[in-house]
């Protein structure tokens, strides 16, 4: 997420919503605190622990959830993050035009 923000020249404050793939609650808390994100802007409709993270389509579910939340709130930018095996991760910026 930091690398994505650096590449785009944006800050956490420029992002309305974050869809964080939280396989474990403690991991989500760490990411929120480490990045300085307002918890109210993270997984506003519930995340993987509440909604689920179906095998093979977690990214699709998360991107769709983020897009719907941005539309419902009239917000412009969101970031979706996904964990990848081997302690890796990916983040994507979504911007409504």
State where each predicted segment sits.
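Claisen-condensing/thiolase-fold acyl-transfer catalytic domains that form or cleave C-C bonds
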Residues: 1-97
């Amino acid at each position: 997420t930091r690398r994505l923000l650096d590449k785009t020249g944006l800050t956490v404050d420029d992002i309305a919503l974050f869809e964080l793939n939280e396989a474990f609650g403690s991991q989500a808390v760490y990411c929120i605190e480490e990045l300085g994100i307002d918890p109210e802007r993270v997984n506003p409709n519930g995340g993987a622990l509440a909604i689920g993270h179906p095998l093979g389509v977690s990214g699709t579910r998360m991107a769709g959830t983020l897009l719907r939340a941005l539309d419902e709130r009239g917000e412009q930018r969101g970031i979706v993050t996904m964990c990848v095996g081997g302690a890796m991760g990916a983040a994507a910026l979504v911007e409504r035009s």
